[in-house]
Design a protein with these regions (language model features):
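Acidic/His- and Gly-rich active-site-bordering loop/insert found
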Residues: 3-104, 113-129
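Histidine/acidic-residue-rich, glycine-tolerant segments that coordinate divalent metal ions
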Residues: 85-87, 92-103, 110, 127-196
């Protein structure tokens, strides 16, 4: 079986797992810089999979390392945000937010659940690639000064230093199975701008 077939097979295998993770995270949202339980939960999932990780990076951030053959050869990072927004959920679904006035309205539950699934796939395939994949679970994306800058000050981009970082954001107008990308910065946030 070639690597593409193995990836597809593992993606099918972990699809129910990723849905389960997304629904759990959706049901238990936490605001920016308050992601205590979210961080613990994500760490427990990494631990259960046997994936090396470190908690408390820049507050509630987590960094996981999936080391392939020759782990120092090259390093690539994947990043997902994990905070929610101060919005009351109106959806009527079995996994509706249990935290009044807080919900995952921006897809960060999907981002974190997807990265958990990807980390497991990469862990299963670690004998097939060279280098290290650094999985970054970022707190505080929705609030200034932003969890990324705090994680950077706490050394997230060192030991090992990634040559590149990839992030994702769900985008409902794209059909399932499609990926949109462009060069340069592209992510948005709910920052406010005051013109005086």
């Amino acid at each position: 079986m070639d690597i593409k077939e193995r990836i597809l097979e593992l993606a099918r295998q972990y699809h129910p797992y990723s849905i389960e993770q997304r629904r759990y995270l959706h049901q238990h949202p936490e605001l920016s810089f308050e992601e205590v339980q979210t961080s613990r939960y994500i760490a427990s999932q990494l631990r259960d999979a046997g994936i090396e990780h470190r908690q408390g990076v820049g507050g509630h951030g987590i960094v996981a390392l999936v080391k392939g053959r020759q782990p120092h050869k090259r390093v690539v990072a994947l990043r997902a945000d994990m905070d929610a927004l101060p919005i009351e959920e109106a959806n009527n679904v079995p996994y509706k937010s249990l935290n009044n006035g807080v919900m995952h309205a921006c897809g960060h539950d999907v981002h974190s659940a997807s990265l958990l699934g990807v980390a497991r796939i990469l862990h299963d395939l670690r004998d097939t690639f060279e280098g290290t994949i650094k999985c970054i679970f970022q707190p505080g994306e929705e609030r200034l000064p932003g969890g990324a800058s705090i994680m950077i000050k706490d050394g997230v981009l060192e030991k090992p230093k990634p040559a590149s970082i990839f992030a994702q954001h769900v985008h409902p107008p794209l059909r399932a199975g499609m990926v949109g990308f462009r060069p340069g910065m592209y992510m948005a946030s709910s920052d406010e701008l005051f013109v005086t």
